[in-house]
C-alpha cells in the first residue's frame, strides 16, 4: 500500500514518516496508534489497534445467565455499571421479564450517575491536559483569573483572587519540588498549547475541584448498588429494598434519609456541570477556535440505540433518541434495530479472529470469538515486539462492527447530533446556547453543523450530556419519591427467577447509552445456560480496524489530515483520541520508523 482511496471517502498514504504511539490508553486493554505524516507533518494515514484480547465471551459460555452481569461488569473499571446494565437487560429481553417502575427509576439514576461521573473525570483528569498547561499557570495574575472566571462562569462561588492565588501557590510548591507527579512528562513547551496563563490557572483549579465532587456523586451507587466501582445489579430489578421506616445500618433498606442524600448529591452535580464544566469547555474552546480538526466520521456517519426512556419499554419516550445518520444528512435519520442481522454485523478481515467466511460479517447472536493472532508479511519486528504493523493484513484484537455496511461513530457527540437533528428541544437549547456563548467569546459565527463534528465538539457534547443527565436524575428522583409515597415499594420481579420457568431456548439483547457510546450485549440461552454471548462496546465501533471493503473506523478517520506541531510530541494525536474518552492513564512511548525511542509520555 502507498496511496489508496477508501469507500468512506479517505485518501490513505503510508509513504511518509511513521510515528508509533504505543500504548495510547485503554478502555478494555491497551490501544496502539500508528500514523504516517507528510513533509508538512500532516497525518495522511492512521492505524488504530487494540492490543489485548478480552475473551469474556468465551468465559461466559455454559454459565448461568443470571450471573453474566457480574462477569461483564469487569470489562472495565471506569465505565462501571453500564455493562452490567446491558447484561441484565439482555437476559430480561430474552426471558420476557419486566421490571417494576421503581427498579427502572433506580437503574436510570445509577446509569446517569455513571454518565455524569465518567464525563467529569474524563474531561478534567484524562483529557484536559491535552489542552491545559498547568506549568504555564504559574505566570497567571490571580486577579485577572478571577475576572475570567466571572466572565465565563459567574455563578461559581469559588472565584476570588485569593482563591486562585492559593491554588497558584500550591502549584508553585509542587513544581519547585521537582516532583511533578500527575503533570510529569507533559509537553509543556509545545506550541500546540494555546491557553493564556489565567485560563490555565482557572482550569487547573477546577481540575482539583473535580477530584472532590467525583468522589461524592458515586456514593449514590453505594446506596443503590452496595459499592463503587462495580455496583450490584440483578435480573428482574435492583438488589435494594425500600422501607421508609428502616434504620441506617449497613445493608438496611432504603429510607427517606438515604434518598434525601441522593438528591443532595444530584443537585451538587447539576450545579457543577452548569457553573463549572460547561463554561470551562466553552472557555478553553475559544483559545482553540481554529482547531476544528478531528471530526472524522462524526461529520458523516453517526449511530446510537437511544436510551433513558421516560416510560420503561416504550422507546418512543427515550430522552436521548437513537438512530443513524449517513453522509452528513441531518435531514434523514434512519431507525436502528439491534435484532436485525442486516443492520448490525461484525467483520474480522483485519482482526485477529477467525470466521467461516471472513468476507462476510456476522450478527452478534451468531457471533464467533475464535482468536487467530497472525501478522502480515510487511510487519516490522516480531510477534512479541512489533515495531510497525501491516495494516493490509490483520492488525487488531478489535472486530469491525458496521451498521448496514457503514463505519459509524458512536458516543455523546453522535447522540447530540442525532437528537439535534430529531428536534430534541433540550438538546437544541443546550447546543445553541453553548455555541452562542462560544461565538461571542471567540468572535466567530459557527453553526452546529460546522462546530460539532470536531474534537472540540466531541468534548463539548460530553459536557452537555453530563448536565442533561443531572437534570434527568432530578426528575427520576421525584418520580421515585412519588411512587413510594403512593405505596409502591416494589423493586424486583422474581416471577421468572427459577430457570424451570424459562423456555428451552431463548435469545435477547440489552442496549445502553454508555459514556463512550452505543453499548450492546446479545445473548443466546439454551437449557438454562449461556450458549453464546457477544458484546459490541463503544470502542469496538470507534476503534475498529478496516473492514473487508476498506472502510476505516472512527479513531482512524478522526486523525486524518490533522497537522502536527512536532510529531515526536504527539499532542494532537492524544488530543483527538482522548476526545473519544479513553478510560485509564497509562504510559505512552513514541517511536520512530525503525523503532528507536524518541520520547516517553505518561497519558493522564
Curated annotation (Swiss-Prot):
Any single Gene Ontology cellular-component annotation: plasma membrane
EC identifiers of the protein: 1.12.99.6
Keyword DNA damage in annotation: no
Membrane topology: Peripheral membrane protein
Free-text comment on the cofactor: Binds 1 nickel ion per subunit.
Annotated residues for binding of Ni(2+): 76, 79, 583, 586
Main location: membrane
Reaction catalysed by this enzyme: H2 + A = AH2
GO MF annotations, alphabetized: ferredoxin hydrogenase activity; hydrogenase (acceptor) activity; nickel cation binding
PROSITE patterns in the cross-refs: NI_HGENASE_L_1 (PS00507), NI_HGENASE_L_2 (PS00508)
Gene3D superfamilies: Cytochrome-c3 Hydrogenase, chain B
Cellular localisation: Cell membrane
Cofactor(s) essential for the protein: Ni(2+)
InterPro entries: Ni-dep_hyd_lsu, Ni-dep_hyd_lsu_Ni_BS, NiFe-Hase_large, NiFe/NiFeSe_hydrgnase_LSU
Keywords assigned by UniProt, alphabetized: Cell membrane, Membrane, Metal-binding, Nickel, Oxidoreductase, Plasmid
Function per UniProt: This enzyme recycles the H(2) produced by nitrogenase to increase the production of ATP and to protect nitrogenase against inhibition or damage by O(2) under carbon- or phosphate-limited conditions.
Subunit structure: Heterodimer of a large and a small subunit.
Record-stated family: Belongs to the [NiFe]/[NiFeSe] hydrogenase large subunit family.
Protein name: Uptake hydrogenase large subunit
Amino acid at each position: 500500500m502507498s496511496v489508496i482511496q477508501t469507500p468512506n471517502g479517505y485518501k490513505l498514504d503510508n509513504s511518509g514518516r511513521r510515528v508509533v504511539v504505543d500504548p495510547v490508553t485503554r478502555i478494555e486493554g491497551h490501544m496502539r496508534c500508528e500514523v504516517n505524516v507528510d513533509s508538512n507533518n500532516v497525518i495522511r494515514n492512521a492505524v488504530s489497534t487494540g492490543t489485548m484480547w478480552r475473551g469474556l465471551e468465551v468465559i461466559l459460555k455454559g454459565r448461568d445467565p443470571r450471573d453474566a452481569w457480574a462477569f461483564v461488569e469487569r470489562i472495565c473499571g471506569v465505565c462501571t455499571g453500564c455493562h452490567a446494565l446491558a447484561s441484565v437487560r439482555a437476559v430480561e429481553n430474552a426471558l420476557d421479564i419486566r421490571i417494576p417502575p421503581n427498579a427502572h427509576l433506580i437503574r436510570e439514576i445509577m446509569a446517569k450517575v455513571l454518565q455524569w461521573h465518567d464525563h467529569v473525570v474524563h474531561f478534567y483528569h484524562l483529557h484536559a491536559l491535552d489542552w491545559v498547561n498547568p506549568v504555564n499557570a504559574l505566570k497567571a495574575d490571580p486577579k485577572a483569573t478571577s475576572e475570567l472566571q466571572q466572565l465565563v462562569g459567574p455563578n461559581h462561588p469559588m472565584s476570588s483572587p485569593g482563591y486562585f492565588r492559593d491554588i497558584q501557590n500550591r502549584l508553585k510548591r509542587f513544581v519547585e519540588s521537582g516532583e511533578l507527579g500527575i503533570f510529569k512528562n507533559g509537553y509543556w513547551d509545545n506550541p500546540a498549547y494555546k491557553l493564556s496563563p489565567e485560563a490555565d490557572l482557572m482550569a487547573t483549579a477546577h481540575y482539583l475541584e473535580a477530584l472532590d465532587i467525583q468522589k461524592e456523586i458515586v456514593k449514590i451507587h453505594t446506596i443503590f448498588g452496595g459499592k463503587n466501582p462495580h455496583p450490584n445489579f440483578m435480573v428482574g430489578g435492583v438488589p435494594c429494598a425500600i422501607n421508609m421506616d428502616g434504620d441506617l445500618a449497613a445493608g438496611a433498606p432504603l429510607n427517606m434519609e438515604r434518598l434525601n442524600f441522593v438528591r443532595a448529591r444530584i443537585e451538587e452535580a447539576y450545579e457543577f456541570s452548569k457553573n463549572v464544566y460547561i463554561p470551562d469547555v466553552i472557555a478553553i474552546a475559544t483559545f482553540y477556535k481554529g482547531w476544528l480538526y478531528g471530526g472524522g466520521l462524526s461529520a458523516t456517519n453517526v449511530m446510537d440505540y437511544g436510551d433513558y426512556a421516560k416510560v420503561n419499554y416504550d422507546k418512543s419516550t427515550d430522552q436521548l433518541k437513537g438512530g443513524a445518520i449517513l453522509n452528513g444528512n441531518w435531514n434523514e435519520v434512519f431507525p436502528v434495530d439491534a435484532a436485525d442481522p442486516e443492520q448490525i454485523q461484525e467483520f474480522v478481515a483485519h482482526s485477529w479472529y477467525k470466521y467461516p467466511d471472513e468476507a462476510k460479517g456476522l450478527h452478534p447472536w451468531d457471533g464467533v470469538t475464535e482468536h487467530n493472532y497472525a501478522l502480515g508479511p510487511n510487519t516490522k519486528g516480531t510477534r512479541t515486539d512489533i515495531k510497525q504493523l501491516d495494516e493490509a493484513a490483520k492488525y487488531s484484537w478489535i472486530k469491525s462492527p458496521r451498521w448496514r455496511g457503514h463505519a459509524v461513530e458512536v458516543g455523546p457527540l453522535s447522540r447530540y447530533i442525532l437528537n439535534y437533528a430529531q428536534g430534541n428541544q433540550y438538546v437544541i437549547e443546550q447546543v445553541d446556547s453553548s455555541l452562542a456563548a462560544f461565538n461571542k467569546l471567540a468572535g466567530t459565527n459557527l453553526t452546529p453543523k460546522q462546530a460539532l463534528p470536531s474534537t472540540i465538539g466531541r468534548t463539548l457534547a460530553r459536557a452537555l450530556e453530563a448536565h442533561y443527565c443531572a437534570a434527568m436524575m432530578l426528575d427520576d428522583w421525584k418520580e421515585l419519591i412519588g411512587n413510594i409515597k403512593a405505596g409502591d415499594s416494589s423493586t424486583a420481579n422474581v416471577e421468572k427467577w427459577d430457570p424451570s420457568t424459562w423456555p428451552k431456548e431463548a435469545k435477547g439483547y440489552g442496549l445502553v447509552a454508555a459514556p463512550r457510546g452505543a453499548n450492546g450485549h446479545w445473548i443466546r440461552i439454551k437449557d438454562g445456560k449461556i450458549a453464546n454471548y457477544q458484546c459490541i462496546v463503544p470502542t469496538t465501533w470507534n476503534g475498529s480496524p478496516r473492514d473487508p471493503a476498506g472502510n476505516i473506523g472512527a479513531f482512524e478517520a478522526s486523525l486524518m489530515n490533522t497537522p502536527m506541531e512536532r510529531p515526536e510530541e504527539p499532542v494532537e494525536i492524544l488530543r483527538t483520541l482522548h476526545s473519544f474518552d479513553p478510560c485509564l492513564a497509562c504510559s505512552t512511548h513514541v517511536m520512530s520508523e525503525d523503532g528507536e525511542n524518541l520520547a516517553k509520555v505518561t497519558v493522564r
